[in-house]
From Swiss-Prot:
It comes from Cryptococcus neoformans var. neoformans serotype D (strain JEC21 / ATCC MYA-565). Residues 1026-1042 have a biased composition (Pro residues). This is mRNA 3'-end-processing protein RNA14. The gene is RNA14. Residues 899-910, 933-948 have a biased composition (Basic and acidic residues). The lineage of its organism: Eukaryota, Fungi, Dikarya, Basidiomycota, Agaricomycotina. InterPro entries: HAT (IPR003107), Rna14-like (IPR045243), Suf (IPR008847), TPR-like_helical_dom_sf (IPR011990).
Length: 1064
C-alpha cells in the first residue's frame, strides 16, 4: 500500500464515524420497533434476535475502528502496512486481544447492563482472525459457514509477512468462562465474509450497501463471557434486566423477567425476592395482575399464594371472575374441580361465595330454555348442582341467598298436569322445611315466604304444616341471635392470619372456640346424629379455613374426632394441619403419636425428619439476622483504631498521628460493648431454637426405641450428633435411655463423656452428669468431674456446681471434708455469710429448722403477729434529731361512720386505725410543712389513703407530735402491729426508706394535690395490665417462698451479713 496523505486518513476517519452513527441508529430503530410491535408473550423469544442484530452491528463497528491505518513514518513502515493488509493469514495463531474490565458507571449500575469489552487496535488481519477464532471470542461469537454447518473450516495457508516497526504490546491471556445460553446468537458466516481487510473508500461504500447479516434465533455455539481486571473506557453496552430483579429466588412458573407483572413492578419484585414467603407482597402482585387483566400473571401468582393460603376465598374468587370474564371455561372447571371436593374433606372450600360462583357458572353453561328438547336434562343438572352446594355449605348462615335462589328455581319449573304440579309443590315444601330449621340471615323472610306458599295451596293444611315447623323455626331464630353475638366480633381478613401471640390473637382464638363449643352443644336440638355431625364438621372446616396457621385449633378439631372414635378423620385433620403449619411441634407430635398407634412407622420417621429439616434453616437465618443487628449496633469502625492498637502494643500512649490512644480505645470498647449487648440478648433466642431442635431429636429417639428397639434409637442419636444445632440435652437423654434400658452404666458414662468434650463449659450439663454419677454411687468419678469442671468454669457461673457438690458432701461426706470444702468456697465466694453455709449443712431436703426456729423466718413468712412483749425495733439512723416538732394545726373533723357493711375481725389489727396513727411514718413526721400555695382549693377534707377499700374514720383535731429521734424506737411497740411493723403501721424497711427521703423544706418545685395525682394514676391504661384489686381488710398468708437448688430462700443474705442469694 502506498504512502497515504494525512488528509486521506482524516477523510477515512470521518467516513467511519458516519458509518458508526448509521449502524447505531439502525440498531436502535430495530429494537424500538420490535418492542412496540411484539406482544408481551413473544418479547422474551424475539429479544435474542434483536440483541444478536445489535451485537453484529457493534462487531462491525469495532472492526472498523480497529482497522484505522496508522500514519506511516517511513517507507519501511508503509511496506509493513501493505504486508499486514494482505488477506492471507500467518501460520502462527493470532496474538491474543487485550481485554480489560470496565467499571460500570452510576447509570449502568441502575440498569444492570452487561459491559462488552472493547479491544485495542491490533492489525486488520488479527481482528478478522480473532472474530473467527472462538477461543479469543468475547461477547459476540462469530462462526464461519463451515463451522455452522458442521464441516471443518479451511485452515489458512502459512505465508511469512514482514513485521511492522511498531508492534502492539502483547497482552496476557484472558479467562473465558461459559456464559448463559440466553446470550444472543452468533452471526452467520456471510457477516464474516463481508468484513473487509482494508479500509479503502471503495470498500467503505460496499460495507454500507451490504445486506444485513443473517440473525439466528438460537445460538450456534456457547457464548463466552470474558472476565477482565483492568478498566478501559466503556464503548458498547448490551441491555439486560435490572440488577435489583436478579436474585437466587426464581420467578413463579409461567413468568419471565419480561412478564408485565414483573417488568412493571420492580420494587414489589425486589421486596418479594427478599422475602418470598410474604403473603402481602404476593397478594399485591396478584391484585395488580387481576386489575390489569393479565391472566397468565394472575394464575402464576395465585399458584404461589395458594401454597400457604389455599383456603383464602377472596383471591380465589377474583381469579374465577377473571377467568369467567375472559371466557376461559376450561380453567374455571379446573379450579372448581380442585377446590370443591364433595367428600367434605378439610380442604373443601368453606366460603359461601365460592359455592355461589360455582352455581353461577353452572347456570351460565346450562342455559334453560323452556320448551327445548333438553330442557329437562338442563333442569336436572342445575338441580343437582344446587343440592350439591347446599349439602356442603347449606349450614352456613350466609347461605340464605342460595336457599332462596334454589326455591325460586324450583318454583319456576313447568307443570303440565296435576301430577307435575303436586310433585313440584311437594318438592318446594321439603326445601322450605329444610331451610326454616337453619339459623340463616334471611330466615324470617324464608318463613314468611313459606307461610304464603302453604296458604296459597290450602289454608286448612297450611296450619298443620306451619304448626309442625314453627318450634324449629323459633329455635333457629333464637339460635341466629346467639350465633351473631358469637361470630360477628371475629375479624375476617383476606388471608388467613399468622399467630403473633398477642392478646388480640387470644381473643380471636377464644371466640372461635366459643363458636365451636356452641355448635357441639346442639343448640338447634337436632335429633339426627349424622346431620348434627355434618353441621359441626362444617363449622370446624370453616374455622380451620380462616385460622389456617393456628396449630391450637387444628389440635382442637382432631381431639373432637378422636373423642368420637373417628381416627381416620382425626388423622386427616392432623395431616392437613402439619401441611398448614410445618413447624408446629404440637401437630407433628400429635400426628406422630396417632400414626405410631396405627403402626405406621415410616410416616413417623418422615414426620420427625421433616420437622428437623424445617427448623434448621430457621436457626441459620436467625444467626444471620443477629449478626446484622450486631453490626448495626456497633456502628462504623472507629477511625485510627488500628494505629492505636499498634501503639498500645509497643507501649506508646500516642499513635502515629499524634492522637491519644486512650480515647480511641475507649470508643472501641464502647463499640464492642454495644455489639456484645445485642449478642447476649439475641443469643438467647438462638439457644431457644437450638434447644427446640434438640427436643425433636429426643422425641425421635424415644419413638425409635419404642417402635424398633434401642439399636434404632442409637442410630437416631448418631444422626443427631451430626446436626450443627445440637445441644447437651440430646447427650443426656441418650445416656439416660441407655442406662434405664440396658442397666449398663458404662455406656451411659461414655455418652456423657462424649458430650463433655463439646459442652465442658456448660454448667447445666456438668451438673446433670454429676447428678447421674452420684445417683449410681460413683463418687470417685463424680469427684474427678467436679475438680475438672471448677477449673474450666470460672466465676459466678460455677456457683450452681459448687452448691450441688456441697449438698452431696453435707449429706454423705465426713466432717473434715466438709470443712475443707467450706474453706475453698469461702475463697471462691467471699461475700457469703458463714451463717448461711452453716445452716445449709444442718438442713435436710430443704427443711431448715435454724431459719424457722432460731431466726424467725417462719413467722415472717406466715405473717404471724409477735406476742405482746417489749419487742425492740432496730435502731435506725437519727434522721429526726434536728427536726422540731410540728405545730398543731386544726383539721376538719370527719363525721363518724354509723354503720359498716362487714366489720373487720377482732383478732386482726386494722390497717388504718386513725388518720393520726396512720400519719406517724418517719417521712410524714417532719417539721412544719409550708402552707399550701392554693388555699382556695382546700374546700374539702383530705381523703384517706384507702378511701376506696375502708370506711372513713374520725380524724383527730390536731396532729400529735412526732416521736423522738433515735431512742423513740426503743419504746414498747404496740401489740396491734407486732415486731415487723413501725408505729405508723408500715413495714419497717419501708418506714426506714421513707425516713431517708429529704425534708419537705428542701423542695422548691410546684406543689400538686395528692388527689389530682392519684386520679391521674388511677386513669392510666397500661397495656397488658389492669388495675390491681383493692387490698383486703384481713391479712392472709404471704406467697410461698421461692425454692432454689435444694433449699428455701425466705430473705436476702444482707439481713445476716452476706450479699449473695439465699436465706442467709
Amino acid at each position: 500500500m502506498s504512502h497515504e496523505h494525512p488528509a486521506e486518513i482524516v477523510h477515512q476517519l470521518q467516513s467511519i464515524d458516519s458509518i458508526q452513527q448509521d449502524l447505531a441508529d439502525t440498531a436502535a430503530a430495530v429494537v424500538d420497533a420490535a418492542s412496540q410491535s411484539l406482544p408481551p408473550q413473544h418479547a422474551a423469544q424475539d429479544q435474542k434476535s434483536h440483541s444478536t442484530l445489535l451485537d453484529n452491528a457493534e462487531a462491525m463497528e469495532s472492526i472498523l475502528e480497529s482497522a484505522i491505518p496508522a500514519a506511516p513514518g517511513s517507507s519501511s513502515t508503509a511496506a509493513a502496512s501493505d504486508a499486514i493488509g494482505d488477506n492471507n493469514f500467518t501460520a502462527s495463531g493470532p496474538p491474543p486481544i487485550s481485554n480489560t474490565v470496565v467499571a460500570p458507571s452510576a447509570a449502568d449500575d441502575e440498569t444492570g447492563d452487561v459491559i462488552v469489552v472493547e479491544s485495542e487496535t491490533p492489525t486488520t488481519t488479527n481482528v478478522v482472525e480473532a472474530v473467527v477464532n472462538p477461543e479469543n471470542d468475547g461477547d459476540v461469537p462469530i462462526e464461519s459457514t463451515e463451522q455452522s454447518s458442521g464441516q471443518p473450516a479451511e485452515q489458512p495457508t502459512e505465508q511469512p509477512t514482514e513485521q511492522p516497526t511498531e508492534q502492539p504490546a502483547e497482552q496476557p491471556a484472558v479467562e473465558t468462562p461459559q456464559a448463559p445460553q440466553s446470550t444472543p446468537a452468533a452471526p452467520a458466516a456471510s457477516a464474516v465474509e463481508s468484513i473487509p481487510t482494508t479500509l479503502e473508500e471503495t470498500h467503505l461504500e460496499q460495507i454500507v450497501q451490504a445486506p444485513a447479516p443473517t440473525v439466528h434465533t438460537e445460538p450456534l455455539t456457547p457464548v463466552v463471557d470474558i472476565k477482565m481486571e483492568e478498566k478501559p473506557m466503556i464503548e458498547h453496552v448490551a441491555w439486560i434486566p435490572p440488577q435489583g430483579i436478579h436474585s437466587d429466588v426464581f420467578l413463579p412458573e409461567g413468568l419471565t423477567e419480561y412478564s408485565p407483572s414483573v417488568s412493571q413492578n420492580g420494587e414489589l419484585i425486589r421486596s418479594w425476592r427478599a422475602d418470598p414467603s410474604n403473603p402481602t407482597l404476593l397478594l399485591s402482585l396478584f391484585n395488580w395482575a387481576v386489575q390489569k387483566t393479565e391472566v397468565e400473571d394472575a394464575r402464576a401468582w395465585y399458584r404461589v399464594l395458594a401454597v400457604d393460603n389455599p383456603t383464602a376465598a377472596q383471591p380465589l374468587l377474583a381469579l374465577i371472575n377473571l377467568e369467567l370474564a375472559l371466557s376461559n371455561f376450561a380453567e374455571v372447571e379446573a379450579i372448581f374441580a380442585s377446590t370443591l371436593k364433595g367428600s367434605a374433606g378439610i380442604t373443601t372450600a368453606a366460603d359461601v361465595s365460592i359455592w355461589a360462583a360455582y352455581l353461577h357458572y353452572i347456570r351460565r353453561q346450562n342455559p334453560l330454555t323452556e320448551g327445548s328438547a333438553n330442557a329437562a336434562d338442563v333442569r336436572s343438572t342445575i338441580t343437582e348442582a344446587y343440592e350439591f352446594a347446599l349439602r356442603e355449605c347449606g349450614f352456613d348462615r350466609e347461605s340464605g341467598d342460595i336457599w332462596d335462589e334454589y326455591i325460586k328455581f324450583v318454583a319456576s319449573g313447568p307443570a303440565t298436569n296435576q301430577w307435575d304440579t303436586q310433585a313440584k309443590n311437594d318438592n318446594l315444601r321439603k326445601i322450605y322445611q329444610r331451610a326454616v330449621c337453619i339459623p340463616l340471615n334471611n330466615i324470617e323472610a324464608l318463613w314468611k315466604s313459606y307461610d304464603n306458599f302453604e296458604s296459597s295451596l290450602n289454608k286448612l293444611t297450611a296450619k298443620k304444616y306451619l304448626a309442625e315447623k314453627s318450634p324449629a323455626y323459633m329455635t333457629a331464630r333464637t339460635a341466629l341471635r346467639e350465633l351473631r353475638a358469637l361470630s360477628d366480633p371475629i375479624p375476617k381478613p383476606i388471608l388467613p392470619p399468622y399467630p403473633t401471640f398477642t392478646e388480640q390473637d387470644r381473643q380471636v382464638v377464644g371466640a372461635w372456640k366459643a363458636c365451636l363449643r356452641w355448635e357441639e352443644g346442639n343448640p338447634l336440638v337436632i335429633e339426627n346424629h349424622e346431620l348434627l355431625q355434618s353441621r359441626i364438621g362444617y363449622a370446624l372446616r370453616k374455622c380451620l379455613g380462616e385460622m389456617r396457621h393456628f396449630p391450637e385449633l387444628w389440635h382442637y378439631a382432631a381431639s373432637y374426632y378422636s373423642k368420637l372414635g373417628k381416627q381416620d378423620e382425626a388423622a386427616e385433620i392432623l395431616e392437613a394441619g402439619v401441611n398448614a403449619c410445618p413447624k408446629s411441634f404440637l401437630l407433628t407430635f400429635a400426628y406422630a403419636e396417632l400414626q405410631e398407634e396405627r403402626k405406621a412407622f415410616p410416616t413417623c420417621h418422615s414426620l420427625y425428619t421433616t420437622l428437623i429439616s424445617k427448623l434448621n434453616p430457621e436457626v441459620d437465618e436467625l444467626r444471620q439476622n443477629v449478626a446484622r443487628e450486631i453490626d448495626i449496633a456497633r456502628g462504623p469502625p472507629i477511625p485510627g483504631s488500628e494505629k492505636a492498637a499498634v501503639a498500645a502494643a509497643v507501649g506508646d500512649s500516642i499513635d502515629a498521628d499524634g492522637n491519644d490512644i486512650s480515647d480511641i480505645q475507649r470508643l472501641v470498647e464502647e463499640r464492642e460493648q454495644r455489639g456484645a449487648l445485642v449478642a447476649q440478648r439475641r443469643g438467647k433466642d438462638i439457644e431457644e431454637l437450638m434447644v427446640g431442635i434438640s427436643v425433636v431429636w429426643i422425641m425421635y429417639m424415644r419413638f425409635a426405641r419404642r417402635a424398633e428397639g434401642i439399636k434404632a434409637a442409637r442410630g437416631v442419636f448418631g444422626k443427631a450428633r451430626k446436626s450443627p444445632h445440637l445441644t447437651w440435652q440430646v447427650f443426656e437423654a441418650s445416656a439416660l435411655m441407655e442406662y434405664h434400658t440396658n442397666k449398663d452404666a458404662a455406656v451411659a458414662i461414655r455418652i456423657f463423656e462424649l458430650g463433655l468434650k463439646q459442652f465442658s463449659e456448660d454448667v447445666d450439663y456438668v451438673i446433670k452428669y454429676l447428678q447421674f454419677l452420684l445417683s449410681i454411687n460413683d463418687d470417685n468419678n463424680a469427684r474427678a468431674l467436679f475438680e475438672r469442671s471448677v477449673v474450666r468454669i470460672m466465676g459466678d457461673k460455677a456457683r450452681p456446681l459448687w452448691d450441688a457438690w456441697a449438698r452431696y458432701e453435707y449429706t454423705y461426706g465426713d466432717l473434715s471434708a466438709v470443712h475443707k470444702l467450706e474453706a475453698r468456697m469461702s475463697e471462691v465466694f467471699p461475700e457469703d455469710a458463714p451463717l448461711k453455709r452453716f445452716a445449709q449443712r444442718w438442713s435436710y431436703n430443704g427443711i431448715d429448722q435454724i431459719a424457722i426456729r432460731d431466726l424467725g423466718f417462719n413467722r415472717a413468712r406466715m405473717g404471724v403477729a409477735a406476742p405482746p412483749a417489749f419487742a425492740i425495733a432496730p435502731v435506725l439512723p437519727p434522721v429526726h434529731a434536728s427536726i422540731p416538732a410540728p405545730i398543731a394545726v386544726p383539721t376538719p373533723v370527719q363525721p363518724p361512720q354509723e354503720s359498716y357493711k362487714r366489720p373487720a375481725p377482732e383478732d386482726i389489727p386494722p390497717r388504718r386505725p386513725s388518720s393520726a396513727e396512720f400519719s406517724r411514718s418517719p417521712k410524714r413526721h417532719r417539721a412544719q410543712s409550708p402552707p399550701r400555695r392554693y388555699p382556695e382549693r382546700d374546700d374539702r377534707p383530705p381523703p384517706g389513703r384507702y378511701r376506696d377499700s375502708l370506711p372513713p374514720v374520725k380524724a383527730p383535731s390536731s396532729i400529735p407530735p412526732p416521736p423522738l429521734a433515735g431512742p423513740a424506737y426503743a419504746t414498747p411497740s404496740s401489740g396491734a402491729y407486732g415486731g415487723d411493723k413501725d408505729r405508723s403501721g408500715l413495714e419497717k424497711p419501708l418506714a426506714w426508706f421513707m425516713a431517708q427521703l429529704p425534708n419537705a423544706r428542701s423542695f422548691d418545685g410546684p406543689v400538686f394535690r395528692p388527689d389530682d395525682i392519684m386520679k391521674l394514676f388511677g386513669g392510666l391504661s397500661l397495656p397488658g395490665a389492669g388495675m390491681p384489686p383493692a387490698p383486703p381488710i384481713s391479712r392472709g398468708p404471704p406467697p410461698p417462698p421461692m425454692q432454689s437448688r435444694g433449699y428455701y430462700e425466705p430473705e436476702r443474705d444482707r439481713r445476716y451479713g452476706g450479699h449473695g442469694s439465699g436465706r442467709y
